[in-house]
């Protein structure tokens, strides 16, 4: 066998080139014990808090407890495949997720991996899940409306862009339905509104049944709302660390829009289950328990998440992230630990009540207990003009209704108040999946507060509203357009609206 000289020089060059290459050093540790989704790892001396580590078979985990002789790692996946003595590698990266418009229309898990079978996500950017909230200087006070399409909320408990409004109530009172209707209400703006008004939606399902999440996605898809929405799902069968992480992952995805001068809305459904998952992790990591066995930093868990919802000022792009966290109460007890925590963090709350729900008042909003701490600065002027008196009238009505149960002989003024209140309550009812545009709400509420419903039987109010809206949408488009463009009820518009309602009321009778 003969080797040519040229070949020898090529081989020597290759050898010389590869000589002295340093071996790659990666820091590894060893699993001491594993169980209940927690691994104790020996080694990994330089690991960072919150760093992603990798177990054999590609299972990932996150270092949470950094102790003197071992590291407590929570496992994002099944712990069955990890055994004592397994080698654990550092990745050097803090937990992050893909973000950007590529995620719109997709369903992902808490680590941003697609779970909808529509192929991989080619995101151009990744972000850390747990970042610091914007400070005081980059923010601006909330002043633009974030319309939900629900009369009871937009008129009485208005939510602004950049606000955090808690949705709180017992199970099966329609909490998720409020978030779903709000998402669906953004469709007209996405279809033919200006880009600067578009609101991208993120839904985070924590500890929900898979069937519930599938139903939610199906409704969004059928109604064409999935194209501007992202769904992050950590269902009941997912490990606790995934349920803990999902809200932070969803928030990072929403922040991408906020920081790029766009607007996003995120619904956390629900934070009670995130707190339970966090409690489970903390107790298994042997952190000391506090009230109701929650760890001492469970308040910080929710406050650092919800503080990231903000309205940024013009120098920072004027984007916003609005949060609608959900809390499930047990037996209407809003003074339990987690509900009081989240009430104190948010800028107002929407209380949903079981007995209202069963009385057929849906959405089952308790108007007396619900507040928006941003208030009317998150409403257009037209809505302020018509809805100003309605809250007071309803408060008087509730007081009188409780009182009137005892006495039969009521004077005319009280009778009038009770009649008006019953009709306004009826007017605020709304079927699911039928959000109304703001200008339509203004017209309907104008009819309610100006006595057009007083002569009708209570069971006719719904029909009157449907008929009035149909008439306005076909014969009086100019009135609705006027309210939409002017954002206020000028004398001219008021006269036109009054004439339109008068004409319809005559034909309805």
Curated annotation (Swiss-Prot):
PROSITE patterns the record matches: ATPASE_ALPHA_BETA
Family to which the UniProt record says this protein belongs: Belongs to the ATPase alpha/beta chains family.
Gene Ontology cellular-component terms listed: plasma membrane; proton-transporting ATP synthase complex
Natural source organism: Brucella canis (strain ATCC 23365 / NCTC 10854 / RM-666)
Cited function: Produces ATP from ADP in the presence of a proton gradient across the membrane. The alpha chain is a regulatory subunit.
Subunit composition and interactions: F-type ATPases have 2 components, CF(1) - the catalytic core - and CF(0) - the membrane proton channel. CF(1) has five subunits: alpha(3), beta(3), gamma(1), delta(1), epsilon(1). CF(0) has three main subunits: a(1), b(2) and c(9-12). The alpha and beta chains form an alternating ring which encloses part of the gamma chain. CF(1) is attached to CF(0) by a central stalk formed by the gamma and epsilon chains, while a peripheral stalk is formed by the delta and b chains.
Class of the enzyme per the UniProt entry, highest EC level: translocase
InterPro entries assigned to the protein according to its UniProt record, in alphabetical order: ATP_synth_asu-like_sf, ATP_synth_asu_C, ATP_synth_asu_C_sf, ATP_synth_F1_a_nt-bd_dom, ATP_synth_F1_asu, ATPase_a/bsu_AS, ATPase_F1/V1/A1_a/bsu_N, ATPase_F1/V1/A1_a/bsu_N_sf
Keywords, alphabetical: ATP synthesis, ATP-binding, Cell inner membrane, Cell membrane, CF(1), Hydrogen ion transport, Ion transport, Membrane, Nucleotide-binding, Translocase, Transport
Location relative to the cell: Cell inner membrane
SUPFAM superfamilies reported in the protein's UniProt record: C-terminal domain of alpha and beta subunits of F1 ATP synthase, N-terminal domain of alpha and beta subunits of F1 ATP synthase, P-loop containing nucleoside triphosphate hydrolases
Residues reported in the UniProt entry to bind ATP: 169-176
A Pfam family matched in the record: ATP-synt_ab
Membrane topology recorded in Swiss-Prot or TrEMBL: Peripheral membrane protein
PANTHER family: ATP SYNTHASE SUBUNIT ALPHA, MITOCHONDRIAL
Name of protein: ATP synthase subunit alpha
Site (Required for activity): 370
Transmembrane domains' residue ranges: none
Gene: atpA
EC numbers on record: 7.1.2.2
Gene Ontology terms, MF aspect: ADP binding; ATP binding; proton-transporting ATP synthase activity, rotational mechanism
Catalytic activity: ATP + H2O + 4 H(+)(in) = ADP + phosphate + 5 H(+)(out)
């Amino acid at each position: 066998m003969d080797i040519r000289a040229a070949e020898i020089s090529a081989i020597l060059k290759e050898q010389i080139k590869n000589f002295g290459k340093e071996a790659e050093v990666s820091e590894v540790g060893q699993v001491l014990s594993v169980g209940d989704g927690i691994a104790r790892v020996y080694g990994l001396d330089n690991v960072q808090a919150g760093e992603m580590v990798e177990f054999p078979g590609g299972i990932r985990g996150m270092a949470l407890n950094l102790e003197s002789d071992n590291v407590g790692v929570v496992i994002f996946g099944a712990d069955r495949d990890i055994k004592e003595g397994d080698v654990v590698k550092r990745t050097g990266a803090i937990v992050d997720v893909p973000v950007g418009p590529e995620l719109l229309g997709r369903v992902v898990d808490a680590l941003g991996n697609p779970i909808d079978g529509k192929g991989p996500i080619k995101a151009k950017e990744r972000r850390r899940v747990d970042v610091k909230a914007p400070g005081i200087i980059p923010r601006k006070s909330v002043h633009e409306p974030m319309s939900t399409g629900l009369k009871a909320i937009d008129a009485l408990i208005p939510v602004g862009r950049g606000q955090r409004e808690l949705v709180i109530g017992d199970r099966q009172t329609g909490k998720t339905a409020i978030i779903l209707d709000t998402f669906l209400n953004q469709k007209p703006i996405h279809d033919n509104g200006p880009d600067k008004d578009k609101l991208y939606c993120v839904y985070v399902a924590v500890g929900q049944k898979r069937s519930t999440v599938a139903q939610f996605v199906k409704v969004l898809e059928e109604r064409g709302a999935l194209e501007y929405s992202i769904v992050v799902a950590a269902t009941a069968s997912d490990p606790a660390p995934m349920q803990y992480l999902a809200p932070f992952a969803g928030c990072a995805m929403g922040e991408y829009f906020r920081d790029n001068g766009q607007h996003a809305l995120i619904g956390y459904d629900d934070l009670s289950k995130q707190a339970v998952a966090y409690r489970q992790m903390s107790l298994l990591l042997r952190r000391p328990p506090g009230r109701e066995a929650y760890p001492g930093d469970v308040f910080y868990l929710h406050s650092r998440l919800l503080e990231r919802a903000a309205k940024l000022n013009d120098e920072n792009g004027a984007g916003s992230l609005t949060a609608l966290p959900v809390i499930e109460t047990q037996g209407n007890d809003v003074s339990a630990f987690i509900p009081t925590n989240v009430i104190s963090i948010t800028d107002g709350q929407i209380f949903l009540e079981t007995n209202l729900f069963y009385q057929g008042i849906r959405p089952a909003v308790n108007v007396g207990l619900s507040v928006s701490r941003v208030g009317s600065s998150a409403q257009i002027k037209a809505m302020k003009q018509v809805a100003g008196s309605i809250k007071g009238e309803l408060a008087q009505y509730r007081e009188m209704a409780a009182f009137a149960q005892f006495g039969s002989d009521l004077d005319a003024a009280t009778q009038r108040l009770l009649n008006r209140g019953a009709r306004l309550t009826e007017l605020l009812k709304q079927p699911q999946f039928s959000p109304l545009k703001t200008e339509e709400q203004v017209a309907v509420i104008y009819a309610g507060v100006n006595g057009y419903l007083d002569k009708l039987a209570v069971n006719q109010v719904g029909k009157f509203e449907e008929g009035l809206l149909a008439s306005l949408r076909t014969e009086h488009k100019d009135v609705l357009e006027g309210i939409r463009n002017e954002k206020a009820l000028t004398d001219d518009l008021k006269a036109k609206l009054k004439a339109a309602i008068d004409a319809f009321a005559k034909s309805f009778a």
